[in-house]
Amino acid sequence: MLLDDLYEIVEPITADLGYILWGIEVVGSGKLTIRIFIDHENGVSVDDCQIVSKEISAVFDVEDPVSGKYILEVSSPGMNRQIFNIIQAQALVGFNVKAVTLAPVGSQTKFKGVLERVEGNSVILNLEDGKEISFDFDELKKLRVSPDFS
């Protein structure tokens, strides 16, 4: 699978450069966009993104993991970072999040609330209406931090 191959190639590159690979997202059809999110204990600058992008591009030129043309984007995960795995979710307990499910729960697929806790492979949200809801992480299409500026 493309995503697994990309992680296998990109993880050692980012680690060797001193960055944390936060996640990889592949979007589009035809000409793909490969988004690589990096983090660092001191934050991530534009220069950091350029360094990582240059190294990854050089390896992609040799390994050729993507057939056809693609766009490579390297950035920090940002304040409204996507949560790519259960370990990241555990570290973000207490944060406001938005969740999108793969299949409707009741009649909705979008939920907003506080990431209350993580139990095994499940995330438990305290929704804005005070109700608690649990999702298996694999049932989520997307889970993202939703900063509250109020």
UniProtKB/Swiss-Prot annotation:
Pfam families: DUF150_C, RimP_N. InterPro entries: Ribosome_maturation_RimP, RimP_C, RimP_C_sf, RimP_N, RimP_N_sf. It is found in: Cytoplasm. GO terms for biological process: ribosomal small subunit assembly; translation. Keywords: Cytoplasm, Ribosome biogenesis. GO terms for cellular component: cytosol. Belongs to the RimP family. NCBIfam families: PRK14633.1. HAMAP family: RimP. Required for maturation of 30S ribosomal subunits. This is Ribosome maturation factor RimP. The gene is rimP.
